[in-house]
């Protein structure tokens, strides 16, 4: 009986370790494809494969979100201010806000969202969405970018998206480094400290 218990416990432990290893390996291999091109708040093209040789902090949002999205953006503003004081923001790291609702979040809407947080339109924080002319293909691109980082979302039909609650730190080649919680759980000091260690 004791032998069976030991074997069962060992198998359960192996299963847990295998599961943890799977998720660690999956995250380590996560990367936004370089071929993805989206539209900025200025109606310019942003291609992930272009020479953006900076770390990137990425959040996925929709501007009609009533709580967690604007809370995250506000906390990222506080983080931006910390990074600006040390001369890191813009020089070594770029912020990206990607809309998961490009039908409503036009470039103009994204610019208004940016302005509502007092964010400078200087290219150091880029707001990405789809283009009206290619909205269907851009929807797929946004989904591909999100899925590459295991960020999931769905519109249940009422315009209020159900979505994952993580932001993502990427390296200069858009490869996953670490994820951080969104909303009230986003700790700007913790993220600041982690980013500083990467530089």
Predicted regions and their residues:
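Thiol-/selenol-based redox modules, centered on thioredoxin-like
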Residues: 152, 156-199
């Amino acid at each position: 009986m004791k032998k069976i218990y030991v074997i069962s416990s060992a198998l359960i432990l192996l299963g847990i370790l295998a599961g943890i290893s799977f998720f660690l390996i999956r995250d380590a291999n996560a990367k936004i494809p370089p071929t993805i091109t989206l539209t900025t708040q200025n109606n310019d093209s942003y291609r992930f494969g272009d020479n953006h040789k900076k770390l990137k902090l990425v959040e996925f949002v929709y501007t009609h979100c009533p709580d967690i999205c604007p809370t995250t953006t506000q906390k990222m503003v506080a983080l931006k201010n910390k990074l600006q004081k040390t001369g890191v923001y813009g020089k070594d790291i770029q912020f990206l806000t990607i809309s998961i609702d490009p039908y409503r979040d036009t470039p103009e809407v994204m610019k208004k969202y940016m302005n509502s947080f007092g964010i400078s339109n200087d290219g150091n924080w880029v707001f990405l969405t789809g283009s009206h002319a290619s909205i269907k293909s851009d929807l797929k691109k946004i989904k591909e970018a999100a899925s590459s980082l295991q960020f999931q979302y769905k519109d249940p039909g009422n315009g209020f998206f159900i979505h994952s609650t993580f932001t993502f730190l990427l390296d200069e080649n858009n490869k996953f480094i670490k994820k951080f919680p969104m909303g009230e759980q986003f700790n700007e000091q913790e993220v600041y400290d982690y980013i500083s260690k990467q530089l």
